[in-house]
Amino acid sequence: MAKKSMMERHAKEQKFKVREYNRCPLCGRSRAYLRRFDMCRLCFRDLASKAQIPGVKKSSW
């Protein structure tokens, strides 16, 4: 989990557009963010294994 201070800082309007970055809305993680699903890889993996994300299934080959 991200610190509460980091979450509050992210919510503020940035002075420059370049400083904006994506953060997972579920856990607050800023790294390994998947834009397509709007969450980090850890939350994505957890929800996908519980079959809570429609259209996602485990691949095997």
Curated annotation (Swiss-Prot):
GO terms for biological process: translation. Its cofactor is Zn(2+). Zn(2+) binds at C24, C27, C40, C43. GO terms for molecular function: rRNA binding; structural constituent of ribosome; zinc ion binding. Keywords: Metal-binding, Ribonucleoprotein, Ribosomal protein, RNA-binding, rRNA-binding, Zinc. It holds the Pfam family Ribosomal_S14. Binds 1 zinc ion per subunit. One of its GO terms (cellular component) is cytoplasm. InterPro entries: Ribosomal_uS14, Ribosomal_uS14_bact, Ribosomal_uS14_CS, Ribosomal_uS14_sf. PROSITE patterns: RIBOSOMAL_S14 (PS00527). Part of the 30S ribosomal subunit. Contacts proteins S3 and S10. Binds 16S rRNA, required for the assembly of 30S particles and may also be responsible for determining the conformation of the 16S rRNA at the A site. NCBIfam families: PRK08061.1. Belongs to the universal ribosomal protein uS14 family. Zinc-binding uS14 subfamily. This is Small ribosomal subunit protein uS14.
